[in-house]
Amino acid sequence: MLQITYSKKAEKFLRKQDKATQHRLFTAISKLPLEGDIKKMQGVSGYRLRVGTYRILFDVNGLIVDIIDIGNRGQIYKGV
């Protein structure tokens, strides 16, 4: 079984979202790293998952999935 950890930035973003958006994001995260529109990021380590207009940046270390950041499509890559 995979363990999922969240950065403070990711937790903060999730808390600010409405319940429907939170549900969509948590559902997508629960299926990591097996399903979804997943691509390896270029220039940095890690992967990105597309969930509608949101992007989830994560890394996989053995049985641990680290959620690095979550954000809107246009703004998520600026901090990376």
Which residue ranges define each predicted feature?
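Enriched for short, Lys/Arg-rich terminal
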Residues: 1-4, 20, 31, 51, ...
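Basic, amphipathic "hinge/linker" alpha-helix immediately C-terminal to the N-terminal HTH DNA-binding motif
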Residues: 6-10
